[in-house]
Curated annotation (Swiss-Prot):
Homodimer. Residues 1-50 form a transit peptide. The lineage of its organism: Eukaryota, Viridiplantae, Streptophyta, Embryophyta, Tracheophyta. Pyridoxal 5'-phosphate binds at residues 139, 243-247, 321. The modification N6-(pyridoxal phosphate)lysine is found at residue 108. Pathway: Amino-acid biosynthesis; L-cysteine biosynthesis; L-cysteine from L-serine: step 2/2. It comes from the Eukaryota. It comes from Capsicum annuum. This is Cysteine synthase, chloroplastic/chromoplastic. One of its GO terms (molecular function) is cysteine synthase activity. Keywords: Amino-acid biosynthesis, Chloroplast, Chromoplast, Cysteine biosynthesis, Plastid, Pyridoxal phosphate, Transferase, Transit peptide. GO terms for biological process: cysteine biosynthetic process from serine.
Length: 374
């Protein structure tokens, strides 16, 4: 694992840190990315080393290069790291799955790739013709936007106006068209607007992250196996946010199949605890409630404070949902019955995406008031 963190480009290599001269990259002939140095196989398409020949002006295989064919080849295989300081009082170990290290810094990079690829394989969409439409709170939109940009799709996203400014800027940077909706209506309002755009736009296709089976499927095929292999099957408990239902359902189902005794714990906001009979909302179609053994509610204030402490104590700059997942994992790790167990927790997104949000409000205000020393 250290080799991936310290040398991410050479970690794509077959099994050495330096490719041998005159050696054809073995990744080229495989059906998925293989990381022999960490004994890992992940179900993304194979890497093909290509370049344009100056003489023939046609794609030519180049020997010995460890270069991804395109940005989608960089999705997945995110590292895990133990939490060491914030876990005071815990009797179980907690290892965080750092989805913040995806190409666009969130777990939604996986489903952006999966949903677009799945629709292409089924002949439902094609670049340059289809207009992709999707409601999003931000991160799924970004996961779709960078892939849409790399493949030549026009993308229209609807998003509650309450989402952070950073997300809007990033989406526009990738060329996505952004339509803001009434924040009081939450994601329901964004979904309604997306359906309206779909009905009024020729050749439009809505990806439906909340109901698209390609969402949990990618987690079943990649996230689950990655956690299982990185923990050598020693994982006892998985803690993950509920969100669209994809991460916890797909990952949880895979882990349960490997070991039915693994506990799957979902995390949802106290302010919108639809699974616990709280305020109105909607339960996503992708959520497999049978996979979950327990649901823990975390308030927004608790999530924000925990995210701050992860930066200060662990050096991990994460988003609010990661703070919620971390606190839930810490609560579970303090239970006497979990002594000596291994808890894996998914950190879904990077903190830099929340600079304009309440997460960094006090720091932002402090920085805005700073004056130069003369």
């Amino acid at each position: 694992m250290a080799s991936i963190i310290n040398n991410p480009f050479t970690s794509l290599c077959c099994n050495t840190n330096k490719c041998e001269p005159n050696r054809i990259c073995s990744l080229r002939s495989q059906q998925s990315l293989v990381f022999d140095n960490v004994n890992r196989k992940v179900g993304f398409p194979s890497v093909v080393c290509k370049a344009v020949s100056v003489q023939t002006k046609s794609p030519t295989e180049i020997e010995g290069l460890n270069i991804a064919e395109d940005v989608t080849q960089l999705i997945g295989n995110t590292p895990m790291v133990y939490l060491n300081t914030i876990v005071k009082g815990c009797v179980a170990n907690i290892a965080a799955k750092l989805e913040i290290m995806e190409p666009c810094c969130s777990v939604k990079d996986r489903i952006g790739f999966s949903m677009i690829s799945d629709a292409e394989e089924k002949g439902l969409i094609s670049p340059g013709k289809t207009v992709l439409v999707e409601p999003t709170s931000g991160n799924t939109g970004i996961g779709l936007a960078f892939i849409a940009a790399s493949r030549g799709y026009k993308l229209i996203l609807t998003m509650p106006a309450s989402m952070s400014l950073e997300r809007r800027v990033i989406l526009k940077a990738f060329g996505a068209e952004l339509v803001l909706t009434d924040p009081a209506k939450g994601m329901k309002g964004a979904v309604s607007k997306a359906e309206e755009i779909l009905n009024n736009t020729p050749d439009a296709y809505i990806l439906q992250q909340f109901d698209n089976p390609a969402n949990p499927k990618i987690h079943y095929e990649t996230t689950g196996p990655e956690i299982w292999e990185d923990t050598k099957g020693k994982i006892d408990i998985l803690v993950a946010g509920i969100g669209t239902g994809g991460t916890i359902s797909g990952t949880g189902r895979y882990l349960k199949e490997k070991n039915p005794n693994i506990k799957i714990i979902g995390v949802e906001p106290t302010e919108s605890n639809v699974l616990s009979g709280g305020k109105p909302g909607f339960i996503p179609g992708n959520l497999d409630q049978d996979v979950m053994d327990e649901v823990i509610e975390i308030s927004s204030d608790e999530a924000v404070e925990t995210a701050k402490q992860l930066a200060l104590q662990e050096g991990l700059l994460v988003g609010i949902s990661s703070g919620a997942a971390a606190l839930a994992a810490i609560q579970v790790a303090k239970r006497p019955e979990n002594a000596g167990k291994l808890i894996a927790v998914v950190f879904p997104s990077f903190g830099e995406r929340y600079l304009s949000s309440i997460l960094f409000q006090s720091i932002r205000e402090e920085c805005e008031k700073m004056k130069p020393e003369l």
